[in-house]
Regions:
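Short alpha-helical interface elements
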Residues: 49-53, 75, 95, 109, ...
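Extracytoplasmic/periplasmic terminal helices and flexible tails
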Residues: 7, 113-156
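Short, surface-exposed, charged/polar-biased interaction segments
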Residues: 45, 49, 59, 64, ...
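Generic recognition of short, well-ordered alpha-helical interface segments
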Residues: 79, 106, 110, 144-147
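Aromatic- and Lys/Arg-enriched surface recognition patch
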Residues: 87-132
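Feature for secretory/organellar precursors and membrane-associated catalytic proteins
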Residues: 12-100
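Short, Lys/Arg-enriched N-terminal segments with co-localized hydrophobic residues
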Residues: 1-10
Length: 156
């Protein structure tokens, strides 16, 4: 028949972070926003591998405040998607939500982009929205209790 129903299968390509993230940084620098899947478990419980995607976009330095999640190069030149937990002079201290002690230091110049939205189960949540900002604020402030909260989360 003239019209034919074909099953179209969406191809999924997986690239190493070392390959894709420099390109993501370049696109953001050119003014684009880029959506990528979350990989790894360092941002649990708020961002989960295989469940969530984040949209990254540009920023102005004044937006790099405590609680904001950014894609940045650490001191070893690796890209990390972590939350800013403190600012010290011209340094940003980053930590994954699922990390209890490990932190990274970077500078605003090493930040490639900030998370502007989180996509979970097809629904988009603005990272600048009240709900997401409240979660971020509380999580950063709950650092002394985080060990117990993460243990509880991992048992669920």
């Amino acid at each position: 028949s003239f019209f034919r129903t074909e099953r179209v299968q969406r191809m999924k390509k997986v690239f190493d972070n070392e390959v894709i993230l420099p390109e993501v940084a370049r696109l953001i620098e050119q003014g684009h926003s880029v959506t990528i899947p979350v990989r790894g478990n360092s941002m649990n419980p708020f961002l989960a591998d295989g469940r969530d995607r984040v949209t990254l976009g540009g920023f102005i330095p004044e937006e790099l405040q405590t609680g904001v999640t950014v894609l940045a190069k650490d001191a070893e030149g690796r890209f990390v998607l972590h939350r800013i937990i403190a600012r010290r002079d011209d340094r940003l201290i980053l930590q994954g939500d699922g990390n209890l002690r490990q932190t990274e230091e970077t500078t605003p110049a090493q930040v490639a982009g900030k998370v502007i939205a989180v996509i979970r189960k097809g629904k988009r949540y603005a990272a600048g929205g009240v709900l997401w900002r409240t979660y971020s604020y509380c999580w950063v402030r709950l650092a002394p209790c985080r060990r117990y909260l993460l243990a509880l989360y991992r048992r669920l």
